[in-house]
From Swiss-Prot:
Its EC number is 3.1.11.6. It comes from Lysinibacillus sphaericus (strain C3-41). Pfam families: Exonuc_VII_L (PF02601), tRNA_anti_2 (PF13742). It is found in: Cytoplasm. This is Exodeoxyribonuclease 7 large subunit.
Length: 452
């Protein structure tokens, strides 16, 4: 038989390994069995045998997966395992590489956990692209946990110690039992409606997987994902991992750690401020020293050591301009003086004094004429006035009283006819020097041709 028909052990082992790698049914398997020959290496890896009544298989759990265990694997423990089967080429044996392991008794919960995790992961709820950043200096922090557990005490104590400027708003929340998941969802939605907090801490203290199961519910995961406020999950201990941890914006191993992640340390901030202050002072001192050296160098430079040379050309130019200005002012003054003299001569030739004297004399003559005319007019008017007075006096009916006539009045009305009176009437007779009251005794009619 030709030697070409024989495979080497290495080639055969590699071929078998490729078969294992290509089989999709061996990439992720769920197996239950009993732990045997458990060895926890100082490197953190765990080596053991998984067996049942009919078979056994070697298994390895590397440190990265082993650190997530919530329990310590022990001899004879019944467990549920998720992992993949592959060939260890060095010994030509196949073995189970364990990714997750849970103790028996919670098998249904473990399966439900993995199914929901796979579903939400496919939907993209775990992607980093959706994670919101935690604010560096939150003013208000919402805490969703039980008010009777140790978690609330640890969170509040840590927040007040590290960053007392932040206000803590507590949303009392059920964290265990059938009503826990709906209550967690309700308080997350309430905190979003209030819109007063910049970050939320959602969690509780440690416990069994049944105790923590509310944080593995789908409604809680979706409420965390839909929250507009960044959420820090703080469920159980460091080895406990829930669906809420995968969906939240930041996962904290413990409630105390969540508080530390939510706020800065005031002492660190203070030290940072002092350090930056010192750096600024040092920078200012260095800058001042550099500027002082630059100033000294400039002061010792040639132009500044003899500054008169800098402005000497300007001084000479200024002297020239000053001399030219004085000359120009003298020439201009002479021109203005000549113009003034010429103007004075012109004014003298056309002096208004003669015209004023002529008009003065004419004005005086006119005044005399007006005076004479006014005197004549007044005298003439006086004569006319006196003639009018005499005429009025002659026509005045009262003036006849001085010649012996009287005027008779009855009831203050002047009597013009004898028909206006009756016998026994009383009449008032007005004389030029007084009045007389008389009684009518008889009325005598006037005969024709008879004079008074």
């Amino acid at each position: 038989m030709s030697s070409a028909s024989y495979l080497t052990v290495k080639a055969l082992t590699k071929y078998i390994k490729r078969k294992f790698d290509a089989d999709p049914h061996l990439r992720e398997v769920y197996v239950k069995g009993e732990l045997s020959n458990v060895k926890i290496h100082q490197s953190g890896h765990i080596y053991f045998t998984l067996k049942d009544d009919g078979a056994r298989i070697a298994a390895t759990m590397f440190k990265a997966a082993a650190t997530k265990l919530a329990f310590e694997p022990k001899e004879g423990m019944q467990v549920f395992i998720r992992g993949d089967v592959n060939v260890y080429e060095g010994y030509g044996t196949y073995q189970l590489y364990v990714q997750e392991m849970q103790p028996d008794g919670i098998g249904s919960l473990f399966v439900a956990f993995n199914q929901l995790k796979e579903q939400l992961q496919k939907e993209g709820l775990f992607k980093l692209d959706w994670k919101q950043s935690i604010p560096k200096f939150p003013e208000k922090i919402g805490v969703l946990t039980s008010t009777t557990g140790a978690a609330i005490r640890d969170i509040c104590t840590t927040l007040k110690r590290r960053y007392p400027l932040a206000e803590i708003l507590i949303y009392p929340t059920l964290v265990q039992g059938a009503q826990a998941a709906p209550n967690i969802v309700q308080n997350i939605q309430r905190a979003n409606q209030d819109a007063t907090c910049q970050v939320l801490i959602v969690g509780r203290g440690g416990g069994s997987i049944e105790d923590l199961w509310a944080f593995n519910e789908e409604i809680v995961a979706r409420a965390i994902f839909e929250s507009r406020i960044p959420i820090i999950s703080a469920v159980g201990h460091e080895t406990d991992t829930t669906i809420a941890d995968y969906v939240s914006d930041l996962r904290a191993p413990t409630p105390t750690a969540a508080a530390e992640m939510a706020v800065p340390d005031q002492m660190e901030l203070f030290q940072r401020v002092l350090s930056q202050k010192s750096q600024i002072h040092q920078m200012v001192r260095s800058q001042l020293m550099a500027e002082r050296q630059r100033l000294n160098k400039l002061q010792q430079s040639y132009p500044l050591s003899m500054p008169e040379r800098l402005y000497r050309p300007f001084t000479e130019r200024l002297a020239q301009l000053e001399s030219g200005l004085q000359t120009a002012m003298q020439v201009d003054l002479m021109k203005k003086s000549a113009q003034l003299q010429q103007l004075h001569s012109t004014v003298a030739q056309h002096s208004p004094k003669k015209a004023l004297a002529f008009h003065q004399r004419e004005l005086e003559a006119r005044m005399q004429q007006l005076t004479r005319a006014a005197t004549y007019y007044v005298a003439k008017q006086q004569q006319q006035f006196e003639a009018t007075i005499r005429t009025l006096e002659a026509l005045n009916p009262l003036s006849i009283l001085t010649r012996g006539f009287t005027v008779a009045y009855k009831d203050q009305h002047m009597i013009k006819s004898s028909t206006e009176v009756q016998e026994q009437d009383y009449l008032t007779l007005a004389f030029h020097d007084g009045k007389v009251v008389a009684e009518v005794k008889d009325i005598l009619p006037k005969n024709e041709g008879e004079s008074l």
